[in-house]
């Protein structure tokens, strides 16, 4: 952040974009879990992605992390992205904590680990290997690239769920899905009856 090219804005990201005319090469969204939190759908909805599209320069990329959740949430967000952007790639988190999406209005280059590592300034390379598990930037990128997922398979995890929308926040309806699942209800009853079983 210590560069004349960066400007830190403390604001609600969606509201800021809706009031701004600025264009960006990259928009990164890394919302804190839980993904089921009230209002969090506003950062995963088709309407939000329409706003993001208006603020990406030609060739710009949206990068978004989706914390691990149930299949309905994953499918709903993946569907919203696919319906909003013609080019979407997905990568499983190295720690298994969710999915990282890349989305763009133009094809996303498929660079090798060596090419990606070669684009990093030295401070960014040091930051990248600090997080591990790779010991070099190239090794880190090899690991990331080996975790690519099929976006179509993410959408198909729950093929009946619609794209997440502002007025249909699939992620926030988690309790209804869980309570309609007989196996989940059985776990609840076991826990209530003192037969400890985690939910």
Residue ranges and their predicted role:
Residues 1-78, 82-84, 90:
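The AdoMet/dcAdoMet-binding core of the Class I SAM-like
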Residues 1-4, 12-21, 40, 85-199:
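Soluble small-group transferase modules, centered on the S-adenosyl donor enzyme superfamily
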């Amino acid at each position: 952040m210590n560069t004349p090219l960066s400007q830190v804005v403390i604001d609600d990201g969606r509201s800021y974009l809706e009031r701004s005319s600025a264009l960006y090469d990259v928009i990164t969204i890394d919302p804190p879990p839980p993904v089921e939190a009230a209002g969090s759908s506003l950062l995963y909805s088709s309407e939000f992605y329409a706003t993001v599209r208006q603020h990406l320069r030609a060739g710009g990329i949206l990068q978004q992390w989706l914390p691990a959740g149930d299949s309905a949430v994953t499918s709903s967000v993946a569907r919203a992205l696919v319906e909003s952007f013609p080019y979407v790639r997905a990568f499983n988190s190295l720690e298994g904590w969710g999915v990282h999406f890349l989305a763009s209005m133009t094809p996303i280059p498929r660079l090798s680990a060596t090419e990606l590592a070669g684009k990093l300034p030295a401070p960014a390379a040091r930051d990248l290997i600090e997080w591990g598990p790779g010991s070099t930037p190239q090794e880190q990128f090899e690991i990331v690239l080996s975790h690519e997922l099929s976006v179509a398979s993410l959408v198909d995890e729950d093929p009946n769920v619609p794209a997440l929308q502002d007025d249909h926040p699939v992620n926030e309806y988690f309790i209804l899905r869980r309570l309609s699942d007989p196996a989940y209800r059985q776990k609840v009853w076991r826990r209530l009856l003192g037969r400890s079983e985690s939910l």
